């Protein structure tokens, strides 16, 4: 853990509350996938590189991680994507990681050879909820299967199927963001994009993967420890002024705005009930993970 933390740019005041639970969760998922030394992995939607650090730690000196993302260099807070990547490059794990700003089709085209000759697997580490719509997820799996011929895909994402009643608050926050993103005008991602965009559920993601020719060889679910606060932060965002301002500035139809505000009102109602019961933080949704392989 210390090797990973020392390779990450973060606020030391948030080490215990935020970063240790975050990396502990990512290590748990990567171990469930079965990441082993020597692997060459393409990490799609790598963001600021936290997933790359975990994967680089597990693949060792003989492995390598290539992280790609379309995010603007200025995206991210309190540290931007550019600041985070620059820090990682100079760290102990930096030699095992390559960062590139690119979409998947462009990256694969620029390889000038089949991706299967360069990478033995692809990772989608909490990145699919960031995709703008369901078609983009279907297109991704088709690209991975046909163009890249990627033999193995590791994926994980939040599950809307709650196992604990107290996870309902996070689910409502995610669904409210997804609803807004469905109605907003299509445009290129900006510096302040929300985390939940298309927010596809497990069945839709697996339908896209299977339609492209992938099969599930191993899967499971993880209920995060209460110290894992991603869901809590999502609720804070949706209930905050920034989200409301974005809804108002989008010039939606009256019906669309009313639907979003009704979803937000339901979120606040359930969250207030949760707080009256004596709880200060929100329980995170379960995470489902899978290992997919191409072919029969």
Swiss-Prot record:
Pathway: Mycotoxin biosynthesis. Disulfide bonds: none annotated. It comes from the Eukaryota. GO terms for biological process: methylation. InterPro entries: Methyltranfer_dom, SAM-dependent_MTases_sf. Residues 37-142 are annotated as: Methyltransferase domain. It holds the Pfam family Methyltransf_31. Its EC number is 2.1.1.-. Methyltransferase; part of the gene cluster that mediates the biosynthesis of the secondary metabolite ustiloxin B, an antimitotic tetrapeptide. First, ustA is processed by the subtilisin-like endoprotease Kex2 that is outside the ustiloxin B gene cluster, at the C-terminal side of Arg-Lys, after transfer to Golgi apparatus through the endoplasmic reticulum (ER). Cleavage by KEX2 generates 16 peptides YAIG-I to YAIG-XVI. Belongs to the class I-like SAM-binding methyltransferase superfamily. Erg6/SMT family. This is Methyltransferase ustM. It comes from Aspergillus flavus (strain ATCC 200026 / FGSC A1120 / IAM 13836 / NRRL 3357 / JCM 12722 / SRRC 167).
């Amino acid at each position: 853990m210390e090797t990973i933390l020392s390779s990450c740019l973060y606020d030391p005041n948030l080490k215990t509350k935020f970063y240790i639970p975050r990396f502990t969760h990512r290590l748990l998922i990567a171990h469930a996938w079965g990441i082993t030394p020597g692997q060459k992995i393409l990490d799609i939607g790598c963001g600021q590189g936290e997933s790359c650090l975990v994967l680089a730690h597990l693949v060792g000196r003989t492995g390598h991680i290539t992280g790609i993302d379309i995010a603007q260099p200025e995206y991210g807070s309190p540290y931007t994507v550019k600041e985070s990547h620059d820090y990682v490059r100079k760290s102990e794990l930096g030699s095992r990681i390559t960062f590139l700003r690119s979409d998947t089709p462009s990256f694969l085209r620029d390889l000038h050879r089949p991706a299967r000759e360069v990478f033995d697997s692809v990772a989608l580490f909490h990145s699919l909820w960031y995709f703008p719509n369901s078609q983009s997820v279907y297109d991704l799996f088709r690209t991975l299967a046909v163009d890249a011929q990627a033999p193995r895909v590791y994926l994980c994402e939040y599950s809307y199927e709650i196992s604990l009643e107290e996870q309902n608050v996070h689910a409502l926050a995610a669904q409210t963001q997804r609803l807004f993103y469905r109605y907003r005008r299509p445009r290129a991602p900006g510096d302040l994009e929300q985390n939940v965009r298309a927010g596809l559920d497990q069945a839709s993601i697996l339908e896209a993967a299977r339609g492209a020719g992938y099969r599930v060889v191993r899967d499971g679910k993880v209920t995060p420890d209460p110290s894992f606060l991603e869901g809590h932060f999502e609720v804070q965002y949706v209930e905050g002024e920034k989200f409301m301002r974005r809804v108002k500035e989008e010039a939606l139809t009256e019906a669309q705005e009313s639907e979003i505000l009704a979803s937000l009102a339901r979120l606040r109602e359930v969250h207030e009930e949760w707080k009256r019961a004596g709880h200060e933080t929100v329980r995170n949704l379960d995470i489902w993970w899978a290992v997919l392989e191409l072919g029969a």
